[in-house]
Amino acid sequence: MITGIQITKAANDSLLNSFWLLDNEKGEARCVCAKAGFNEDDIVPVSQLGQFEYREIPMEIKPEVRVEGGQHLNVNVLRRETLEDAVKHPEKYPQLTIRVSGYAVRFNSLTPEQQRDVIARTFTESL
């Protein structure tokens, strides 16, 4: 467990009023700020700090969000029949725009193979 502290008394005067993060499991201390002798983010064994007294500092710990990979959803609000009719009669749908892989494209600008793929992916019988 990590504990935030402010050193209130210490044999080493440069530690007075410094702030540290103590990792009791590892027996280490990370310097948050100190007047002298230690740099920000220095990690030292707690024993290196010598004798000291401290007060605990409340810490707000925000969980780290880690996102790997991902998914996206393209929403096309229309009927299957509309796309099938656009394949047969493209002149009737010159402005028909759909979402494909996050981009807006004119349905008529797709190749016939791409059009069939869009129809197959957009309309499924079940999940």
UniProtKB/Swiss-Prot annotation:
Gene3D superfamilies: 3.20.70.20. SUPFAM superfamilies: PFL-like glycyl radical enzymes (SSF51998). Coiled coil: none annotated. Keywords: Organic radical. Pfam families: Gly_radical. Transmembrane segments: none annotated. GO terms for cellular component: cytosol. The modification Glycine radical is found at G102. Residues 5-127 form the Glycine radical domain. GO terms for molecular function: formate C-acetyltransferase activity. InterPro entries: Auton_GlycylRad_Cofactor, Form_AcTrfase_GR_CS, Gly_radical, Glycyl_radical_cofactor_GrcA. NCBIfam families: spare_glycyl. Acts as a radical domain for damaged PFL and possibly other radical proteins. HAMAP family: GrcA. This is Autonomous glycyl radical cofactor. It comes from Cronobacter sakazakii (strain ATCC BAA-894) (Enterobacter sakazakii). The gene is grcA.
